[in-house]
A protein has these predicted regions:
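Helix-turn-helix DNA-binding elements, focusing on the entry/boundary residues of the two helices
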Residues: 5, 16, 27, 44-47
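Short alpha-helical DNA-recognition segment
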Residues: 14-33
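A short, Lys/Arg-rich alpha-helix, primarily the initiator
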Residues: 1-12
Length: 72
């Protein structure tokens, strides 16, 4: 599970459905990304989209993803 991603979403007061809509994907696909079931290796397109949705630099998303990967 990508706890960091859930934390960002909650801080921005967004639902999974809202994030999915902003990314142009279904709520269930976004849920799978957040739960680590999809995009096990997050690609640049998804990382860029998340950075836009959460209004953070893409480098922040990449760093959080790398930290998460290293801790597993």
């Amino acid at each position: 599970m990508r706890v960091w991603l859930k934390k960002l979403r909650i801080e921005k007061q967004l639902t999974m459905k809202e994030v999915g809509e902003k990314l142009g994907i279904s709520e269930s696909y976004y849920c799978a990304i957040e739960n680590g079931e999809r995009q096990k290796k997050m690609d640049v397109v998804v990382a860029s989209g998340l950075a836009t949705v959460f209004d953070v630099p893409i480098a922040h998303i990449v760093q959080l993803e790398q930290n998460d990967t290293l801790s597993q």
